[in-house]
A protein has these predicted regions:
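C-terminal binding/interaction regions
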Residues: 1-79, 85-160
Length: 160
């Protein structure tokens, strides 16, 4: 059985000591999906909605990157790491569902999957925030890690 890493020998919450871990390249890809009701999908023009606050998806991309960079301030035991890259992409399918991908990269002693998860999550929340005045019937779902490379083991949801 795998050990929970953020619990110490005294059974108390604890940050993981990464000081002896090897520095390697780490990449993580997370996704989140946003489902829109028809009253919102009717308002999409060229794959985006423009509001008084600006482009919904442009704001969400910026928010996702900003959030990924601040993950250590939001998740108690995440280490502050100097991220090498963070890319957020939002695609709208024909049914009116937005797929948000956040891919983060770092060369460090610890993984970057929480940063990718936070980036995808906050991008989705930003989409909701910017269009909730039109409808509250927006559903954010399936926020998940798609893949990670580096560290003890790689992970790929499509191959597991």
């Amino acid at each position: 059985m795998k050990k929970i890493t953020h619990i110490n020998k005294e059974n108390k919450p604890s940050m993981v000591d990464i000081s002896n871990k090897e520095i390697t390249k780490r990449v993580a890809h997370a996704q989140s999906f946003v489902n829109f009701p028809e009253e919102i999908t009717k308002r999409f023009v060229d794959g985006d909605i423009k509001t008084a606050k600006g482009s919904v998806f442009a704001a969400a991309i910026i928010a996702g990157v900003m959030a990924a960079k601040k993950t250590h301030e939001l998740i108690p035991f995440c280490h502050p790491i100097g991220m090498d890259d963070c890319q957020v992409n939002i695609e709208l399918d024909k049914s009116g569902k937005a797929k948000i991908d956040c891919i983060c990269k770092v060369t460090h002693r610890t993984g970057i999957e929480m940063e990718a998860m936070v980036g995808a999550s906050v991008a989705a929340l930003t989409v909701y925030d910017m269009i909730k005045a039109i409808s509250h019937d927006i559903v954010i779902e399936k926020t998940r890690l798609v893949s990670k490379i580096g560290g003890k083991e790689d992970f790929n949801r499509d191959k597991s």
